[in-house]
Regions:
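Extracellular and secretory-pathway beta-repeat/beta-biased strand scaffolds
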Residues: 5, 18-23, 27-470, 481-493, ...
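An N-terminal, helix-rich hydrophobic module
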Residues: 5-6, 12-13
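Hydrophobic beta-strand positions
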Residues: 11-12, 131
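Residue-level recognition of short loop/turn positions
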Residues: 15-16, 208, 533, 821
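Surface-exposed repetitive/solenoidal architectures
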Residues: 351-767, 772, 821-827, 832-848, ...
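A short beta-strand segment in extracellular, disulfide-stabilized domains
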Residues: 772-779, 810-811
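Extracellular acidic, Ser/Thr/Pro-rich low-complexity tracts
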Residues: 780-785
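Serine/threonine-rich, repeat-prone extracellular segments and beta-strand-based repeat modules
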Residues: 786-821, 825-831
Length: 948
């Protein structure tokens, strides 16, 4: 009886031009295999089993065997029975019945055949049956198994654990366990398939029970009475695989697939392409767990994972955890409930990324899951010392009342927009958080980058960041509001945590007074205001006779304002006046303002485009607002007593004294910042800083646009120099993470406000013409660009000027954008210049000609006459002597020089010996290089083979 290790398939050999037999696991020519491992062959027969169980011998316990026709009966009279078998196969027409004293009785069957076990017929048991064969076990198509509980394993059970709650299985069996049939356990029963490689391609059912697929060399099953409650892989071998391509149903119960031990450094894979259902049944929620090694394991999530509650009750729980977890775009993951609460899906790998391509899950797949499931993405550094970051690089949106939780031991980086419109939809962001048994990094943070915004527009959405619950603001509020639930109403709780759930139109403030949030030192804002990338538009604050004026009047040391933009703001006051804050002792980051700031009184002090008086920290922020004031007037800050870093101002600035393009009076620190706006004043004016009693480092102003040749601090540059990366790079500016610049077009721009845009050059293929190539074939954008994309596309790279056949790089360029536009990422294309057509004739055919009138070859052949390195012929030469062409050999290039406009080759055969390229030259112009491998065979070959 041949084993499955000896099953072969026929594939075409391109080397031998024939069909050859290869092992079943061998790959044909085609795409390389991915990370998913192929199922190893089970060492059992592919043919029909030839016999029922034979050679049964009772080792312990009491029982007997009998056979009548095609039915074998094992009658068990003790609670535990151990049998040894010489062979245990069930043919398609055969039945094996285990008659046991109770549902809790166990019959252990150790099989000592030299091949694997085949179950192709019927196996029935009212109790629990263990089949153990180190050479493998196959439940073939058509197999029907009905048991109270079953273990099919290539690992042997340790006898002393058999009666306890934890049962250990160990062994060196090399076979696999594969199910292609139907295995059904009684309600509350279980099915466990154990071995180094385990696969279900059939159907397994265990309602209210458990299905466990474990791949490893040591496995522990844990029981509560007769119920299987846990599977743990204790030891691994290389390339352990647990796979499901069929159907597993355990409604109201548990499904667990695990490969490799948790801390093993050996590769292991859990792969689901089939359907796994553990839906709520009789108010019992189901659980599905796909678990790979947390050091080197891989879980591939495809197909369907369904722990929903379609018929009542709450949804269940799904976990997919390993060092690496990859979710297919078409995977269906749900814990939805029609009449109860949605369940949860936990994804727990290292360094997880949401991306349209090249990541671990796409935004579309995550959005689909959130339609009915609470999703928790969890990232840790792991044993390989990854970053521990969780990155959202693709748009995520959902309308259900579900919650997305983002937890990382280091940073949570949101680089693409997240939108939740459900009335009670939620978002939880936990950076710097211990998870998966790993401590927090201690430095992790939440970062909103790349122009991304987080929208929570429902009636009562939820938001938590770093353990703090935020009130989500989606409305302006009435004048004088203190509700604590709208923008104006923040005055009702100045120490709270607030977030903008959407953009707010504040046009109504043009006709009603807006009271600054935290109106003075006695009542400062001491909480956190998280803009989530949103804007407040058309805000008017008219406090002509007041000081400490801005959206926030006075910000305390503990106050934090970040990720917000003020668009079209109109602010008026007498002193300590700014669009975002009048006075700030707190931290302001990733924020900006456009509009006008007007210090109306002649004696107004500290007027700035973003902040009037800064005693705290301003990072990664800018202002384009026009600013007018009296003493201490600056494009970004009027009076700086704290720190300004990685910031800039471009608006015009007009004041009386201490007037600067960035800062009016500096008493603190300014670094890595610049100004380009025009500056005018009566006394003490500067292009960057008006008065300086602090320090100014690596900061610049535009001497042309500011109309100022001097400044109390900083370095003056021309407009051309301001638009060149070189000087800023020498000053230590970070163009990899903080800044970008479009050389010759813009001054430095802050990356955090810009949306990545991939611009890809299209490939080009042209036939050889002897003329240099120029230009390109257009570009493709990763998103629909708008008016923010400026410039004209240009092309560079080795393609420009290319003549000879070959592949050349097309490098696009020429586009640029402003601050709220695009961070352009170019992807090159390829120019392929193909050789002019060359006909290599292996049998009589129509004459081929060389047409030098167009400096190209319509069809031709390369030849060399015997004894010479080249051939020049007279008028209209015709070569009909095939043997002459057998001399096309030699270590260097051979050349054929036709002497007229037409040279015909008839019935030619080419010998492909030699090493150099063969050249065709016409009138001194090199027309083509023909590889010596271009000869075509006389007989056809399969289409899957490469042309030779």
């Amino acid at each position: 009886m041949r084993t499955l290790n000896q099953v072969y398939r026929l594939v075409w050999s391109c080397l031998s031009n024939s069909w050859v037999a290869v092992a079943e696991t061998a790959r044909g020519r085609g795409k390389g295999a991915g990370r998913t491992l192929a199922v190893a062959a089970v060492s059992v027969s592919a043919a029909t089993a030839q016999a029922a169980p034979v050679g049964g011998q009772v080792v312990s316990g009491s029982g007997s065997t009998s056979r009548a026709g095609t039915t074998t009966t094992i009658t068990q009279s003790s609670q535990s029975l151990v049998l040894n078998w010489k062979g245990f196969d069930i043919a398609a027409n055969e039945t094996v019945n285990f008659v046991q004293p109770s549902a809790s009785a166990i019959a252990v069957n150790r099989i000592f055949s030299t091949s694997g076990t085949q179950i192709l017929g019927h196996l029935n048991a009212n109790g629990q049956v263990y089949l153990i064969n180190p050479n493998g076990i196959l439940f073939g198509r058509g197999a029907q198994v009905n048991v109270g509980g079953m273990v099919a394993s290539t690992l042997d059970v340790e006898g002393d654990s058999l009666g306890g709650p934890s049962r250990s299985f160990r062994g060196q069996g090399t076979g696999s366990v594969i199910n292609e049939g139907t295995i059904t356990a009684r309600n509350g029963g279980y099915v466990a398939l154990l071995g180094n490689t385990v696969s279900n391609q059939g159907t397994i059912v265990a309602r209210l029970g458990s299905v466990a697929i474990g791949a490893g060399s040591a496995v522990t099953l844990t029981f509560d009475g007769d119920r299987l409650v846990n599977l743990q892989v204790d030891k691994s071998t290389l390339n352990n695989l647990a796979a499901n391509g069929g159907l597993i149903q355990a409604d109201g119960g548990m499904v667990v697939m695990s490969a490799g031990s948790r801390d093993a450094l050996l590769s292991s894979v859990v792969n689901n392409t089939g359907v796994i259902e553990a839906r709520t049944f009789e108010n019992h929620g189901g659980t599905i767990t796909l678990l790979g090694g947390m050091a080197a394991g891989q879980v591939n999530v495809g197909g369907t994972l369904d722990a929903g509650a379609p018929n009542g009750g709450n949804g269940g729980y799904i976990e997919t955890s390993a060092a690496h977890v990859s979710v297919a775009n078409d995977a269906r993951i749900t814990t939805a409930s029609l009449m109860g609460l949605a369940g949860t899906w936990l994804v727990d790998p290292h360094d997880f990324t949401v991306a349209a391509s090249g990541g671990d899950i796409s935004g579309a797949a995550l959005s689909a899951a959130l339609a009915g499931t609470n999703v928790t993405l969890q990232s840790s550094q792991g044993a390989a010392a990854g970053s521990g970051n969780l990155n959202v690089n693709d748009t995520v949106s959902w309308g259900a009342n579900t919650t997305l939780t983002l937890t990382a031991s280091n940073n949570v980086n949101v680089n693409a927009s997240i939108t939740a419109t459900g009335n009670t939809a939620g978002l939880v962001i936990n950076p710097n958080t211990a998870n998966s048994g790993e401590a927090a990094s201690g430095t992790g943070s939440f970062n909103l980058n790349d122009g991304a915004a987080i929208t929570l527009s429902g009636v009562n959405p939820g938001l938590s960041i770093a353990g703090h619950a935020y009130t989500v603001i989606n409305s302006l509020g009435a004048a004088g509001s203190t509700t604590g639930s709208d923008l104006q109403g923040i005055n009702g709780n100045l120490s709270g945590y607030y977030a903008l759930g959407s953009n707010i139109d504040a046009s109504a403030t043009g006709g009603m007074p807006f009271t600054p949030i935290g109106a003075g030192a006695a009542t400062p804002f001491s909480g956190v205001f998280e803009g989530l990338g949103h804007t407040i538009g058309n805000l008017t604050i008219n406090q002509l006779l007041s000081s400490d004026v801005g959206l926030f009047g006075y910000v305390a040391n503990s106050g934090v304002i970040r990720n917000v933009g003020l668009v079209g703001v109109q602010t008026t006051g007498t002193g300590n006046l700014g669009s975002l804050a009048g006075v700030s002792f707190g931290t302001i980051s990733n924020s900006y303002a456009t509009g006008n700031v007007n210090g109306g009184a002649m004696e107004s002090r500290n007027t700035g485009g973003l902040v009037g008086a800064n005693h705290g920290t301003i990072l990664n922020s800018y202002s384009t607002a026009s600013v007018s004031g009296s003493y201490g007037t600056g494009g970004l800050v009027g009076g700086n007593y704290g720190t300004v870093s990685n910031s800039y101002a471009t608006g015009s600035v007009n004041g009386a004294s201490s007037v600067g393009g960035l800062v009016g009076g500096n008493y603190g620190t300014v670094s890595n910042s610049y100004a380009t706006g025009s500056v005018s004043g009566m006394f003490v004016t500067g292009g960057l800083v008006g008065t300086n009693y602090g320090s100014v480092n690596s900061s610049f102003w535009d001497t042309t646009t500011s109309n100022r040749a001097t400044s109390a601090g900083g370095v003056g540059l021309t407009t051309a120099q301001m638009k060149s990366r070189g000087g800023f790079t020498l000053a230590g500016w970070d163009f990899a993470n903080t800044w970008t610049i479009y050389d010759g077009e813009t001054a430095p721009l802050l990356r955090s406000f810009m949306t990545p845009l991939v611009v890809s050059a299209n490939n080009v293929a042209v036939a050889y013409s002897g003329q240099p190539y120029s230009g390109g074939n257009g570009v493709a954008y990763s998103v629909a660009p708008n008016s923010a994309l400026l410039g004209t596309i240009s092309y560079g790279g080795s393609s420009q000027g290319a003549i000879n056949p070959g592949s050349y790089a097309i490098t696009p360029g020429g586009l640029y954008s402003g601050q709220q536009g695009y961070l352009i990422i170019y992807q090159g294309g390829t120019l392929t210049v193909t050789a002019a057509p060359s006909a290599v004739l292996s049998q009589p055919a129509t004459p081929a000609s060389l047409a030098n009138t167009v400096n190209s070859i319509a069809a031709g052949i390369v030849a060399r006459q015997a004894g010479g390195r080249s051939q020049s012929n007279g008028a209209s030469p015709t070569i009909v002597d095939a043997p002459m062409l057998t001399q096309a050999r030699g270590p260097s290039a051979d050349t054929y020089l036709p002497g007229t406009s037409n040279a015909a080759l008839v019935n030619a055969v080419m010998d492909v010996g030699g090493t150099g390229a063969l050249q065709i030259v016409d009138g001194g112009i090199r027309l083509a290089d023909v590889p010596r491998s271009s000869i075509l065979p006389a007989s056809p070959i399969p289409l899957s083979c490469p042309a030779r």
